[in-house]
């Protein structure tokens, strides 16, 4: 457990390094208005913080910089709420009038990158505005079948699935008829909701093996929506001193171009804010970066992920509060827009 003095010194060191990207020593810190301690006292505390793993030396300076452990402690214990200026910017943005889902998401990506000077990525469902036009099910064998979904946008999707043990062909036929009757014209994002209510009631009434059929339906329709990526500030990373290295730049842009890998990186994000610092990231290309993610919703549907990529000396105070605010505002805006209240 850190002492109050160590906490203050650690916070000042991290704040300074985030702003300057330069190591700092005890003499410079002793001149800070936030540290009423002598250079000798600060030097001793910095040595203890280094022994504890919160600070580390560089090869080119006698000063210290935060370690990943230091950043992690900073994120977990020293972050405050969003300031009024940032909250005002978000409200101004969300007060705008939007006519398309893509407009909302792309604007969010651009605003987030502009406010932070980092690279923003938003994972969104591809078929948010599409409705179901038709569904067909073709049995391939006693154990497998393929469903063909056609949407109002002309998108055709084939999904193979395993048939429940012993399901009758008559039940499968009834199921397809019920789905086409009740789901035609329903937005893709609302399929799970309608299936859980209207469709479930009809299945219970008319089908012999309700449980097996409903389990099949739940596994089939209530999975993740197809995804699309929206970027903001792809070149912002070039403004960071850490990216003077050509190999780092090449590696980063190679990752950005691999949208499937980015989608896989973001799509399993849990609800709320998550901060991954440096080596906490599993993808090699971002092990020198920090990744902050937040989820957004429409109603009860988890629709996607908002993400920011930046250096490990990221402005965590600002970014985390912004991510929380923009996640909430985006959820509210999309909810109002989707329900036709705005």
Swiss-Prot record:
**Role noted for this protein:** Negative regulator of class I heat shock genes (grpE-dnaK-dnaJ and groELS operons). Prevents heat-shock induction of these operons.
Species this protein is from:
Oceanobacillus iheyensis (strain DSM 14371 / CIP 107618 / JCM 11309 / KCTC 3954 / HTE831)
InterPro entries reported for this sequence: GAF-like_dom_sf, HrcA, HrcA_C, WH-like_DNA-bd_sf, WH_DNA-bd_sf, WHTH_transcript_rep_HrcA_IDD
Q: Which Gene3D superfamilies match?
A: 3.30.450.40, Heat-inducible transcription repressor hrca homolog, domain 3, Winged helix-like DNA-binding domain superfamily/Winged helix DNA-binding domain
Keywords from the UniProt entry: Repressor, Stress response, Transcription, Transcription regulation
Q: Which domain of life is it from?
A: Bacteria
Task: Give the stretches traversing the membrane.
Answer: none
Biological processes annotated in GO: negative regulation of DNA-templated transcription
Instruction: Output this protein's name.
Output: Heat-inducible transcription repressor HrcA
Q: Name one GO molecular function term.
A: DNA binding
Q: Which Pfam families match?
A: HrcA
Per the record, the similarity remark reads: Belongs to the HrcA family.
Q: Which PANTHER family match?
A: HEAT-INDUCIBLE TRANSCRIPTION REPRESSOR HRCA
């Amino acid at each position: 457990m850190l002492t109050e003095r160590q906490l203050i010194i650690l916070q000042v060191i991290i704040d300074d390094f985030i702003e300057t990207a330069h190591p700092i020593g005890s003499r410079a810190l002793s001149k800070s208005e936030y540290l009423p301690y002598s250079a000798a006292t600060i030097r001793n505390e910095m040595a203890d913080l280094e022994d504890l793993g919160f600070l580390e030396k560089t090869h080119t300076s006698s000063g210290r910089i935060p370690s990943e452990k230091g950043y992690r402690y900073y994120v977990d214990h020293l972050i405050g709420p969003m300031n009024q200026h940032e909250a005002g910017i978000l409200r101004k943005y969300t007060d705008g009038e939007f006519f398309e889902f893509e407009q909302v998401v792309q604007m969010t990506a651009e605003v987030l990158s502009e406010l932070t000077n980092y690279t923003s990525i938003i994972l969104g469902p591809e078929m948010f505005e599409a409705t179901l036009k038709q569904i067909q099910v073709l049995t391939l064998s006693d154990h497998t079948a393929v469903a063909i979904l056609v949407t109002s946008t002309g998108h055709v999707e084939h999904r193979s699935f395993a048939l429940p043990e012993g399901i009758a062909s008559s039940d499968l036929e009834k199921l397809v008829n019920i789905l086409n009757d009740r789901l035609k014209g329903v937005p893709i994002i609302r399929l799970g909701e309608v299936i859980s209510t209207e469709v479930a009631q009809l299945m219970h009434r008319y089908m012999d093996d309700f449980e097996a059929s409903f389990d099949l339906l739940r596994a089939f329709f209530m999975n993740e929506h197809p995804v699309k990526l929206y970027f903001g500030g792809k070149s912002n990373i070039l403004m960071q001193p850490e990216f003077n290295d050509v190999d780092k730049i090449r590696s980063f842009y190679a990752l950005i171009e691999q949208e499937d890998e980015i989608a896989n990186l973001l799509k399993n994000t849990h609800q709320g804010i998550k901060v991954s610092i440096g080596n906490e990231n599993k993808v090699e290309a971002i092990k020198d970066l920090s990744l902050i993610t937040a989820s957004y919703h429409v109603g009860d549907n988890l629709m996607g992920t908002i993400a920011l990529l930046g250096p490990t000396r990221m402005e965590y105070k600002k970014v985390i509060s912004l991510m929380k605010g923009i996640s909430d505002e985006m959820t509210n805006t999309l909810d109002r827009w989707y329900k036709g209240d705005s």
